[in-house]
Amino acid sequence: MKFLFSLSALLIISHFAHAQTTQRARDLGIPFDGIPGKYNAITDVPGVMVGFKTLISGSGKLVEGKGPVRTGVTVILPKGKTNDGYPAAWFSLNGDGEMTGIPYIEDYGMGYGAIGITNTNSVGIVKDAIGSWNVKHFSKGEFVDYSFGLPVAAETWDG
């Protein structure tokens, strides 16, 4: 029993010790153009805006259909509150996941407006919300109106 306790303690301690010494790519000598900004964050890039909403409801053991809930959405505006285009590409690491707007990105190598990141089951509503926001802010009310565009919304795992 003492052996199992000692082994468990050693594994836990080594995990935290490793987590605190993990180096970043730059620390390992991997070269990148430029230098990190003040916060080393996407918001250091001039013109980029990021917003998020985290939903936390309930506590304790997970009861399917009841909670607790830990989820949210992040929205990135690469060109701020404009509908200006920006270079875009996409990549699938494991072939599992949902993302809207891929055909346009593949065909033109461009994105327009906001990028949403949320849980799997909310990709559709986030895409629709981005489209509605685009219409509200960029529509000129013309017969042909491209302001809804092809919003990009992608999933990330909430777990």
What are these regions, as identified by a protein language model?
Residues 1-20:
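Bacterial Sec-dependent N-terminal signal peptides
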